[in-house]
C-alpha cells in the first residue's frame, strides 16, 4: 500500500523513516494515522509496506517516505536490508506489553550493527497505546531512563486518539535533516581542503 506520488515531488528533500518494533505494538496504526488520519485497529502483518507523503516541515515542503516493517520473527532475516535504506528510525513498543519494551534493545542493536559506519543515527523511542493507561505495564520513568541511556528522545503516543503522532514523525525528520546538513557541511569542508591542497601543489610546481 503506498500513497500516490504527484509530479514535481522528486525535487523535494526526501526523508526515509523506518518503523521498527515487535508485532502488535501499533506501528501500522501509527503510520496510517499519520498518513490518512484514520485509526486502523486490525491490520494484517506483511513483510513491509511503503508510504510517501508531502508535508511542510518548519516552513519547508518535504517528502517523508515511511517503511512499515513487520515485527514478527519470521521476517528478521530480511530486516537488515530495510534498515540499510533507512535514514531515521521510530523504535515502537506498547506501554501495555513489557515484553515489547524489552525487545526494543534487540531491535536497536540490529540497527546499530547494520548502520555501524554512521556516527549518530536519528532514532526516537515511542511508547504507543497511551490511551490504555489502565493496562500500562511499562512505567514512564523506566522507558525514559532507557531512552536517556541511549541518548535519544522518548515520546508516548496513541494511534487511536492521535496523541503525539505528528510529533514523533516531525521530530525524527528534524533529526534526519540535521544529520544530513552536518554531513554535507563535512563533505564540503573536505572538498574545500582538498582543493586548497591541490592549488598549493600546483603553485609549488610552477
From Swiss-Prot:
Lipidation positions, renumbered (S-geranylgeranyl cysteine): 203
Species the sequence originates in: Homo sapiens
PTMs per UniProt: Prenylation is essential for membrane localization. The geranylgeranylated form and the farnesylated mutant does not undergo alternative prenylation in response to geranylgeranyltransferase I inhibitors (GGTIs) and farnesyltransferase I inhibitors (FTIs). The farnesylated form confers resistance to the proapoptotic and anti-anchorage-dependent growth effects of geranylgeranyltransferase I inhibitors, including GGTI-2417.
Protein's recorded name: Ras-related protein Ral-B
Subcellular location: Cell membrane; Midbody
Family: Belongs to the small GTPase superfamily. Ras family.
Reaction equations catalysed: GTP + H2O = GDP + phosphate + H(+)
Pfam families: Ras
Oligomeric and partner information: Interacts with EXOC2/Sec5 and EXOC8/Exo84. Interacts (via effector domain) with RALBP1.
UniProt function note: Multifunctional GTPase involved in a variety of cellular processes including gene expression, cell migration, cell proliferation, oncogenic transformation and membrane trafficking. Accomplishes its multiple functions by interacting with distinct downstream effectors. Acts as a GTP sensor for GTP-dependent exocytosis of dense core vesicles. Required both to stabilize the assembly of the exocyst complex and to localize functional exocyst complexes to the leading edge of migrating cells. Required for suppression of apoptosis.
GO CC annotation: extracellular exosome; midbody; plasma membrane
Regulation of catalytic or functional activity: Alternates between an inactive form bound to GDP and an active form bound to GTP. Activated by a guanine nucleotide-exchange factor (GEF) and inactivated by a GTPase-activating protein (GAP).
Effect upon mutating residue 23 to V: Impaired cytokinesis, as shown by increased number of binucleate cells. Impaired cytokinesis. No effect on cytokinesis. No effect on interaction with EXOC2 and EXOC8. Decreased interaction with EXOC2 and EXOC8
Propeptide: 204-206
Region (Disordered): 180-206
Lineage: Eukaryota, Metazoa, Chordata, Craniata, Vertebrata
